[in-house]
Each structure stands twice: as C-alpha cells, then as structure tokens.
Amino acid sequence: MSKGPILVTCGLPYTNGPCHLGHLRTYVPGDMYVRYLRHRGEEVVFVCGSDNHGTPIVVSAEEQGVTPKELSLKYHHHFEETFIKMGIRFDRFGMTDGKANHHRTREMMQRLIDKGYIYSATVSQSYCTTCSRFLPDRYVEGICPHCGAVARGDECDQGCGKHLEPGEIRDPVCKVCGTRAELRSQEHFFFKLSAFKEFLGTFLKGVRGTDNAKNYALGWVNDDLHDWCITRTLDWGVKFPGRDDLVVYVWVDAPVGYIAFTEEWAAAHGRDWREFWCGDGEITHFIGGDITYHHCIFWPALLKGAGYGVPSAIVASGMLKIDDHKFSKSRGYVVWTNDDYLDLGLPADYLRYYLLAYTSHTKELNFSWQAFADRVNNELVNTFGNFVHRTLHFAHAQGIGIPDLDADQEILQRIDETIAAVDTAMDAFEFKNAVDAVMTLAAFGNNYIQTAAPWKLIKTDRPAAVQVIRNCLQLVRALALLIDPTMPETASKIWMMLGETDQVRDHRTSEATEPLTAGELAPPTTLFARMEEKEVATLEKTLMMRVEEAEKRGQPTEELISIDEFGKMKLIVGTVISAEKIPKSSKLLKLIVDLGSERRQIVSGIAKFYDPEHLVGSSVVVIANLQPVTIFGVESRGMILAAGDNAALLTPNQAVEPGTPIR
C-alpha cells in the first residue's frame, strides 16, 4: 500500500480533431492501471482534461471560421463523451482554458519569477511580412538546425525529435501564406532549465515508469540543456504575468492542468489538492511516447523550481502503425474511435483488450482489422468466453447453481499465483503480461473442465461433478475480478450472472479466493460475439477507401526549388566501415563511412531497421556537404539517404567505388 493518496493523470487530448486509436494507447492503459490500484485497496484520483491552447488550435479555428474557444468546446465534449463510451472513467476531466488552470499557471509563473528562475531576453523570431505578424510554433515550418530534417517551429517532429526555440529553425516559411519569413527581434521570457541539469539527472535515475521515457530524457539531459522560452506572441492562451501581448507557452500551461484539475476535483469533494502535489502522495503520468521530452525534462524542472512535488512515475506508450504503415491522418492510415468503431456498435471491451494484450506498452502496436478479429475470436470467444459460459450454463442446466461447498486447494492456489503474477506485471507497468496472466487462468479453467468432463461425471458420480463445477465457479469469480481493469463491462456481466447484486469494481482482487454465496443461478448470457469474415472485410474496405481518397487528394504542394539549388547538394556513394548503436537511443546508429577521399562519422536514425553488424560493407548514398550537427552528444557530418516507413537504404544497383558522385 502507498503512504499517501495516488494521483494518476493522462496526457491531455488536443482539441483540434477527433479521437483515434493513437489517443487510446494512453488512456486505456491509464484507466486499467487506476482500476487495478482500486481493486488493490489504494486511494486513487484519476484526472485528465482537454488541451485548449497553442498555435494548432488557432490555425484550425481560423481554417474553420470559428473561434478557438468554440473549437475547443466542441472537441472537449467529443473526447469527454468518447472516453465514457470506452469505459475510461476520469474523476475530473477539465479544460486548460478553465479559470482554475489560468490561475494556477500564472501563480506558478509568479513563483518562478520570484525565485529568479525566469528572465527576459531579446530573441530573433520568424516574422511574416505578408500576414504582418510574428510566427510562433506551428505557424512556421523550416529546417531543423540539429539534423537537417523538415521541422515545425517548436519541434523537429520528422527528424531528431528535439525541441526548438523561437528563431532556431532555418529557412522559415509562413504556414498560412507560404511567404519566406524574416527574423525580427522581440522580447520573450525564459525558464532557467539549465539550472536543473543536476536535479534532472538524479530525478530521471530514480523515477519509476517505462525505460523509453527515462532513457531518452537522460540522453537529452546529458547532451546539453538550454534555457527554455516559455512565452509566445498569441492572443489565445494564459496571459504571462504583467504582459498582455504574450501568453504562456502551451507546453507550460498544459501540464499545469494536472494540478488545476486536481484542485477542481478536491474542491468538489472537500479535499485539499496539496495532499497530492505538496505532500506524501504519488503522482503517475501516462503519456504518449512523442511527449517524453516535455514530461521528463521541462515539467519536473518547473515543479521543482516552483516548490511542488515531482512525478513518482512516468509511463510512455509506444508508437502506432495501421496495417504495417506509419500512422498518418493525411495519408488515410488512421482508425477513428467513433466513426470506425463505436458508432458501428462494436464493444468497447474488445478494443480495450486488443490495445492492452497486443504487445508491451512501450513497443510499436501494428493494428489491423484481421489481427483484431483473430484475437477476439481465438482469445475472447474461444478461451475466456467459452469457459465462463460452459461453467455457468452447466451449473444452471443441471440445477447445481452455486453449491454450498469449498473450492479445492489446488484451485485456490492457482488463483493466488495468478494474482501474484498480475501484481508483478502491473508494478512494472507491463500491462500485456498482466492480461496474459488472466488469460492463462482462463485457459487453465478451459482445460480443467474439459479434462474433468462433468457432463460425463454427473451420470456416475454427481457429488464429484458438483465439486468440479464449484471449482469452476471459483475460477469464474476470480476471472471477473481480475479482468475488470481490462474489460469492465464484461466483468460486470459475469458478476451479475454469479448472482451478485453490487458492483465488481467495489471489491478487492484478494476476494477472488473467498467462498461464493450458495444459491441458484439464472441462465447465462453470451459474453462475446464472433467477428465474421464479412464484417472484417467491410472494416478493411473502409480503411482502404480512406487511403485511396487521401492518395487522390495528394499531399500539399511543396515549394519548388531550382536546378541550381538542387545542384548545391553533394551526393556521393560511400561504404559503411563500422556501425554501432548510440547509448540511450533506440533510433540512432553511429556510422563510419568511407567516402573515397576521407572517412566520415554520420549519425543515422535507422537503428530500428538494421543490425549494426549487417551494415558493414554496405554501399550507401550520402549527402556530404551538410553542416555538422551534434545528436545525442555525437557529431554527424552528413546524411544517409533512405526511403519509406522501413528506411530502405538507397544503394547503387552495381558496384561503384566509394566517393563516386551521384549524377
């Protein structure tokens, strides 16, 4: 048991578009974890809310002819309703544009100002002469100064993943009108992130959670830590103290929402929010893998500087693929939670189960309708549902009901072992392992009833057959309690079929081995329906039609370059001499490449697709005249060219000498 109350949060959904499967990889595991803790007897408060500020909201609102407030309210209600349908039960679901968050954000800024952690500085920022305005964040696109990839104004989302400060991006272009932006000076405010380097190093080594969150962040902290610009030139947002022309950067006020939403919950329940943020409470953040930088570096430093408690655990999910393709709304590789699933009448529990059972939480999840249907049919219908229905149907049909007997010790021991396995998995945030342990118990039950064959035994030894069913009913009770965090609607159905009149969620998992109340049983209902091939084909067709429509629309027209500009790139063939992984990075390899006249060290983001030893001797195409950049503390003097989601290396179709130019 924890010393104090536990606060669990989920990364805030952004209110500029509807819910999709990528969102659910954060919220379903978070909800499962909270339900599990409550079954263990812990006091848990589960908060989240919608993220309403930042340039994407403003840009989307302008495109749709509505105000940012109207757009935010529309999608706030959308997410709130979708989460309820998915069985995700937040104790408080607030808005970052609410009064509580405006107040708490400004209060935190003032604390940091008073402690000397915020200072002003004049910076060069992209300015569009056509639109006559400064271009914060996603109003601008350009080239990442660190790795040379196409990047947004505040983040290199296509390359190294680094946060970008205002004015850092190279060759900036206005996203609204396409005009090449110019740099102009403007006063902004900075948070002294560099002062927290030692604290962050210690914090990241001690915080619980998933390694993908901690290790990436440690790499950034050990590399370099720059002070952080925390204001933007926008009207929409939380006003910076004393400045009506500046708002607080969205990646400051969004996580502050965790505190504000806790305050709102506490006010409604007669509690003090400081129990969680200033006392002995535990704070666990569930986030998407793409926002680890903000939650593992910026946020703990802000909390420490302002005198609040810091997170106890940070749990980051892996990425998502759709049918072996990188998740992409613009290319049609997306599954919408409502349009493609809930609105078709498909049960929320099926999708919850699939998301939790498919793979480890930190690994990439490759969704396909066929794989989804296979798991529903083979695991839920054939294994779990089959055992529960066989047991309850036989107990009812033979007039056995719930007999006034004790379950055999072997059965109780097997349940205890399963509970221990679930506890171990959940403590390590290995949600798949926890689900697997429960499904193993269901498979054990299936094998037990099949081997014991009570339908035969009852003809010759009714007491023995009754004991078998009593044992099976104990397993069914255990399965209801253990599967509730994963499939709450299914667990409630089982609980009711066992004749219980209260809610399964109000019971502890340790009660799984307690005796059942003897009595009659009503006829059971079917838990799961098989997914037929025709249904799967229809779902697959919908996805493929979306992809085809996206291909017809094509991608936005890109700015053309002249042949002279293209000619500035020095493309040559090189041979990989050595390759090794870069510590604390799952994506990057350090390559030594023979370019004929010299050997170059190049960092390449292909570690997920190639073993280092297999690259040695390979011919590759290199951009050889890029400015050197440092990535994860390693200097890179060039770029290896690769194509597609699987990073297929570009190579000549016949042998050529290192240093041969591409023409």
Swiss-Prot record:
A motif ('KMSKS' region) lies at residues 326-330. Its EC number is 6.1.1.10. A motif ('HIGH' region) lies at residues 13-23. Keywords: Aminoacyl-tRNA synthetase, ATP-binding, Cytoplasm, Ligase, Metal-binding, Nucleotide-binding, Protein biosynthesis, RNA-binding, tRNA-binding, Zinc. Its cofactor is Zn(2+). GO terms for biological process: methionyl-tRNA aminoacylation. It is found in: Cytoplasm. It is an enzyme of class 6 (ligase). Binds 1 zinc ion per subunit. NCBIfam families: metG (TIGR00398), metG_C_term (TIGR00399), PRK00133.1 (NF001100). Is required not only for elongation of protein synthesis but also for the initiation of all mRNA translation through initiator tRNA(fMet) aminoacylation. This is Methionine--tRNA ligase. It comes from Methanosphaerula palustris (strain ATCC BAA-1556 / DSM 19958 / E1-9c). The lineage of its organism: Archaea, Methanobacteriati, Methanobacteriota, Stenosarchaea group, Methanomicrobia.
